[in-house]
Amino acid sequence: MAFDKKLLEIVACPVCKGKLEYDKAAEQLICKFDRLAYPITEGIPVLLENRATPWQEQTAE
């Protein structure tokens, strides 16, 4: 099941309540403010603080 990008309009980071961005390659939602990544499992975002992992922005070399 694919992630529905329309959800980005209504979901928010559970920590700071800020906007989330979709990382299609990694199948996760990113909060750049808190630098956290939330997994997407079977098309459903898992927006639990204890399931978030630290996120580092990828830089091109």
Curated annotation (Swiss-Prot):
GO terms for cellular component: cytosol. Disulfide bonds: none annotated. SUPFAM superfamilies: Trm112p-like. Coiled coil: none annotated. It comes from the Bacteria. PANTHER family: PROTEIN PREY, MITOCHONDRIAL, ZGC:162634. Belongs to the UPF0434 family. This is UPF0434 protein Sama_1339. It comes from Shewanella amazonensis (strain ATCC BAA-1098 / SB2B).
